[in-house]
A protein has these predicted regions:
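Structural recognition of the beta-strand scaffold that forms the well-ordered cores
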Residues: 64-67, 129-131, 154-155
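Extended hydrophobic/aromatic segments used for targeting, binding, or gating
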Residues: 151-173
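Residue-level detector of flexible, active-site-proximal loop/helix-junction positions
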Residues: 17, 34, 72, 100-102, ...
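Positively charged, proline/Ser/Thr-rich regional signature most characteristic
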Residues: 50, 55-125, 165, 169-173
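A phosphate-binding catalytic loop at a beta-strand-loop-alpha-helix junction
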Residues: 128-140
Length: 173
């Protein structure tokens, strides 16, 4: 999401603090004193999708929509975590559960990333929009895709919370 607001110089601590500590790396309890800087956000609308854009894409098929939720929620066989949401998925979308690209809290290697997306029938050469339950784990898929060379992946940040809550949008099971 940093990139969606024009901040391209971003790093992710792969595996987080638990992996850092497990590797015996130094930590401190000192409070940092970062320098104050000005940042002017520039919204990159090419990296975001609205419900209307995703809905129009169902007919056009111009982009692959890849859902990061687990298979049960995607297929509509497990209940949604938010009350009142319909079950299922965006018509024509594919399912690559984000847990397939994370191992022990860290991103899997590049070969395994590619294999996970290909196993979900994602064509890595075609346009991609990621979705999930609320826009958070869609970012994990987008990061994984970035790591295999796709720096143009869009995120549907409304995701299933918006889609499943709107009766005017179609659902597949």
């Amino acid at each position: 999401m940093f990139r969606a607001f024009g901040h391209d110089d971003v790093a992710v601590l792969d595996g987080g603090l638990p992996k850092w500590r497990a590797e015996g790396r130094p930590v401190t309890t000192d409070t940092p004193a970062p320098a104050t800087v000005d940042f002017s956000a520039t919204l990159r609308t090419d990296l975001l999708r609205s419900a209307d854009q995703v809905n129009a894409n169902i007919a056009s098929g111009g982009e692959q929509v890849v859902d990061a939720r687990g298979a049960g929620r995607y297929n509509g066989t497990e209940p949604e975590t938010r009350p009142g949401l319909r079950s299922g998925h965006i018509p024509g979308s594919m399912n690559v559960p984000y847990a397939k690209i994370i191992q022990d809290g860290a991103m899997v290697d590049g070969v395994s990333l590619t294999q996970a997306f290909e196993a979900g029938n994602v064509d890595l050469a075609e346009p991609i929009t990621t979705s999930c339950g609320s826009g958070i784990t869609a970012c994990i898929l987008a990061l994984g895709l970035y790591l295999v060379g796709r720096d143009d992946v869009a995120i549907y940040d409304g995701s299933w919370t918006e889609w499943g809550g709107r009766e005017d949008l179609p659902v597949e099971k």
